[in-house]
């Protein structure tokens, strides 16, 4: 199977890929959700390409072509299926390079592979679409190489040109917004990275042979809303993931760590709700809103409700939600490497975050104390320094105009303000404190909240670094540079840095080798140098050591246990 889904190998290369295509066809016939997003099936008799889970009648084998990327299928002249909707598939091959066993290799890569992945991450990032990334010269400049070099490396690795990859990414984003929301076409064009409605219409019709407004028929039928859900106070979209997924474990993790006034988990309804502040690229001030994720039972689907006030940053919010819930993980590849050592943990995911700075502060607050105590400190911090939450209402264009108005789409009136919709949860009325707020916080007041001086210094150093732009805490940031920058700050050692890398940077190979509970789970606690023994033991789990850590903690039932059992002294430095 790996030959057919390798991103740098065409589906007609050799006899090996023919056999792999046969395996793809078998997955297609059985609608195996484990392969969703790992390949797309193009049907020559219809000109349409589909996800492996598409519910239409299975096409004949001789009419099928298989592509690792949607961009490759579109480059070959195929259009996305309107029923299975390829834009909803979990991210697949573009998340990394593939080894012979089908696993993504993050830790050991050649320079060309790293460059191709960096380019893809830039093209995937919604913030870049509205922040000047609109040409090959800009992409090459950000990567520090020539246009010719980045084009050659990208095409060799991904099988399509950078511009074709980017165009497909934008058009599929637009397709989802057109289908699932009632946003004006002009706003969809803007959010999808197009400079004008005319360019958007030309690209959409040219690629899909379909007018953008034609997709409104699908949206008018409900857009996939569940029982009791309404799109009146929110944008409602769906997201897919590959099974297995331990929903109960993920929700329990969030419930154990939730901060009162800012987030809430309902285990019965399988929902997690929280507030969010986000600053779109080029905006003068942040947008404030709320998000809710509801796991649909007996389905590999999450319904995402996003307040209309976050509409101007919708693609960015969607990307963060997927990372927060770890929806793009590939359980098949991960389990192939880990299941022998961690049986019964097939569905465990690594919880992410919606805000890297928030996660870093919460990690510092949790050093050397129990999770319950860390929650108490977090609740006090949010109550004292968190900004009161008000949701912006009114027209979507007015909300956008208030933050980062494009001249062509400027709205005449500002939005009104009101509280969180009562259909959600009362009591969610605060936002997590911003970096500027915590950087200016009075140490005496922080002390009155129960935060010791060492943690105060660490939190304020984090805030200053984020404000100065010397520390980036989001997926795609340079892991080595970020971890070095973190450990250069007072009060932050290897354990905290690895924990931040694991959850905020979404680095799948993070491994806090000094973790005491990890030593116990691996049975190395009595060795002379347990940290070195744990590091040596972990080598066979690369590049999925973050998942191994979560599975080891679950073995001891310490995912929600006292952090003081897990974290070594924060002053410790790597050898």
Where does each model-flagged region fall?
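HhH-family (HhH-GPD) DNA N-glycosylase catalytic core used in base-excision repair
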Residues: 1-575
């Amino acid at each position: 199977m790996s030959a057919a889904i390798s991103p740098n190998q065409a589906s007609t290369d050799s006899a090996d890929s023919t056999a792999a295509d046969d395996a793809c066809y078998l997955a297609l016939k059985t609608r195996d959700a484990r392969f969703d997003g790992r390949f797309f099936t193009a049907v020559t008799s219809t000109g349409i390409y589909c996800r492996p889970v598409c519910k239409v009648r299975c096409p004949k084998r001789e009419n099928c072509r298989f592509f690792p990327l949607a961009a490759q299928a579109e480059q070959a002249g195929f259009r996305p299926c309107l029923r299975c909707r390829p834009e909803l598939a979990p991210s697949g091959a573009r998340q990394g390079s593939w080894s012979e066993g089908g696993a993504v290799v993050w830790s050991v890569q050649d320079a060309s592979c790293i460059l191709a992945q960096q380019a893809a991450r830039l093209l995937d990032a919604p913030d870049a679409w509205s922040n000047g990334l609109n040409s090959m010269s800009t992409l090459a400049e950000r990567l520090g190489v020539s246009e010719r070099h980045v084009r050659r490396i990208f095409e060799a690795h991904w099988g399509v040109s950078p511009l074709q990859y980017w165009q497909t990414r934008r058009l599929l984003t637009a397709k989802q917004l057109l289908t699932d929301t009632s946003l004006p076409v002009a706003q969809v064009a803007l959010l999808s990275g197009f400079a004008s409605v005319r360019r958007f219409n030309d690209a959409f019709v040219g690629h899909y042979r379909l007018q953008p407004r034609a997709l409104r028929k699908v949206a008018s039928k409900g857009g996939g809303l569940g029982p009791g859900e309404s799109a009146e106070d929110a944008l409602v979209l769906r997201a897919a993931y590959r099974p297995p997924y331990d929903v109960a474990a993920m929700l329990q993790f969030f419930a154990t760590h939730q901060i009162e006034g800012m987030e809430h988990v309902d285990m019965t309804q399988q929902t997690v709700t929280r507030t969010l502040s986000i600053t779109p690229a080029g905006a003068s001030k942040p947008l404030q809103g709320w998000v809710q994720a509801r796991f649909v039972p007996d389905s590999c689907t999450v319904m995402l409700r996003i307040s209309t006030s976050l509409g101007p940053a919708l693609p960015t919010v969607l990307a963060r939600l997927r990372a927060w819930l770890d929806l793009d993980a590939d359980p098949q590849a991960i389990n192939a490497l880990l299941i022998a050592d961690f049986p019964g943990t097939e569905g465990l995911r690594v919880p992410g975050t919606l805000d890297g700075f928030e996660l870093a502060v919460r990690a510092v607050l949790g050093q050397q104390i129990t999770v319950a105590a860390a929650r108490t400190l977090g609740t006090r911090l949010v109550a004292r320094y968190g900004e009161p939450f008000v949701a912006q209402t009114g027209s979507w264009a007015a909300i956008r105009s208030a933050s980062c108005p494009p001249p062509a789409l400027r709205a005449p009136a500002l939005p009104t303000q009101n509280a969180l919709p009562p259909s959600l949860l009362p009591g969610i009325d605060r936002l997590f404190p911003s970096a500027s707020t915590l950087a200016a916080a009075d140490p005496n007041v922080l002390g009155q909240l129960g935060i010791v001086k060492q943690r105060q210094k660490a939190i304020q150093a984090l805030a200053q670094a984020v404000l100065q732009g010397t520390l980036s805490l989001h997926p795609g940031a340079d892991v080595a540079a970020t971890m070095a920058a973190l450990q250069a700050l007072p009060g932050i050692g290897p354990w905290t840095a690895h924990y931040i890398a694991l959850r905020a940077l979404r680095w799948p190979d993070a491994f806090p080798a000094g973790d005491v509970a990890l030593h116990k789970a691996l049975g190395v606690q009595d060795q002379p140098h347990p940290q070195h023994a744990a590091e040596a033991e972990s080598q066979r789990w690369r590049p999925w050591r973050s998942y191994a850590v979560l599975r080891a903690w679950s073995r001891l039932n310490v995912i929600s246990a006292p952090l003081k059992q897990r974290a070594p002294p924060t002053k410790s430095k790597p050898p």
